[in-house]
């Protein structure tokens, strides 16, 4: 009888080892398969470097001092009204008053077709990109940040509270404004 229990235990231990190896293999596969995406998500949330703000072009574009040279940043996930558009100057002024002559932390996401660094900026640990949407000075730019639903939540709340540009009736999104401007030329 003692021999049977030993055999069963050995079989059980062998099966456990096989499951552990299978599970370890699955974990390695998943890490390799999703690792790049996971890295992108992490990079988006960790500021990389501090820069001095030189000037603000509009509600979603600014220039910083990069050790003596200028670096143009386009805020990730948002689209602010154009300067010539209703609420464009207010959007620019809000951003300017928030970050003028300040040191901001920047997380770089990518480059756009104009060579600007698509970035998330932070001032004293506050995500300024999110702030622009939360306070009604920019739209959630779904086309380029479709998975970042927090911007959508902030936009919805700003609309409900009629904050910023949402205090106007039927504000025109910047992408539509630019498209209409092109077709008129």
Task: Label every model-predicted segment.
Residues 2-185:
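Small beta-barrel nucleic-acid-binding modules, primarily SNase/OB-fold domains
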């Amino acid at each position: 009888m003692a021999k049977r229990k030993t055999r069963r235990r050995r079989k059980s231990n062998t099966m456990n080892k096989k499951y552990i190896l299978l599970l370890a293999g699955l974990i390695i596969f998943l890490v390799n398969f999703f690792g790049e995406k996971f890295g992108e998500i992490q990079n988006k949330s960790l500021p990389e470097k501090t820069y001095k703000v030189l000037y603000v072009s509009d509600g979603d574009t600014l220039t910083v001092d990069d050790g003596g040279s200028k670096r143009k940043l386009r805020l990730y996930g948002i689209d602010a009204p154009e300067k010539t558009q209703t609420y464009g100057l207010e959007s620019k002024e809000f951003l300017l008053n928030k970050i003028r002559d300040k040191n901001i932390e920047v997380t770089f996401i990518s480059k756009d077709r104009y060579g600007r660094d698509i970035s998330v900026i932070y001032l004293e640990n506050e995500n300024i990109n999110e702030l622009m949407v939360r306070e009604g000075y920019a739209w959630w730019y779904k086309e380029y940040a479709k998975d970042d639903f927090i911007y959508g939540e902030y936009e919805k709340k700003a609309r409900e509270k009629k904050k910023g540009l949402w205090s106007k009736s039927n504000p025109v999104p910047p992408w539509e404004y630019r498209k209409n401007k092109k077709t008129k030329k």
